[in-house]
Amino acid sequence: ADCEHIAGELVKRFSRPRNLPNDIAKKLGPDLAQNLHGALPALSLPSMVGFTTAFVNDDVPEYAFAQQVLAFGKPGDILLGITTSGNSRNIVHAVKAANALGLESIGLTGQSGGDLASICKLCIQVPATDVPRVQELHLPVYHTLCQVVEDTLFP
């Protein structure tokens, strides 16, 4: 659910207007231009149910996210890997794939950081070990990330 939430906040405006480039706004016309926002291409890997079902039927499930990174990742992209322990094999494999492609990788984990702490370009470790508490602390972190991205890309 967190992945869906974050992707949604990036695809649409998060906290303030995101003006469309003038050339795009003109092509869209007034109605669309006034009701759409500057957008960022953000994908939630767990939401691709059709792919996931096919992959886990035919291949080793813990590599599904890494396969998606290979399919969709391109230079300049950032992979945000979220795992309370930092040791979720599916997330670790996805980060390794992202690193191999030259993507930036950010981990969002609990206190220890687990395996992600050593393989992500940046690992944000919240000060908790209890899973529900880690998840609660992740919310303000990813809202802050969304705000910083929006402020930077849509001044």
Each model region followed by its residue ranges:
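A charged, well-structured terminal subsegment
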Residues: A71, P132-P155
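Short glycine/serine/threonine-rich phosphate/pyrophosphate-binding segments
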Residues: A1-E4, E62-F65, N87-A94, L116
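Glycine-rich, small/polar surface segments that engage phosphate groups of diverse ligands
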Residues: A1-F72
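Short, glycine/polar-rich helix-capping loops at beta-to-alpha or helix-loop-helix junctions
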Residues: G107-C120
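Short beta->alpha connector loops at strand-helix junctions that form conserved
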Residues: P46, T83, T109, I124-P132
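Short, well-ordered beta-strand core segments
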Residues: L79, S105, C123-Q125
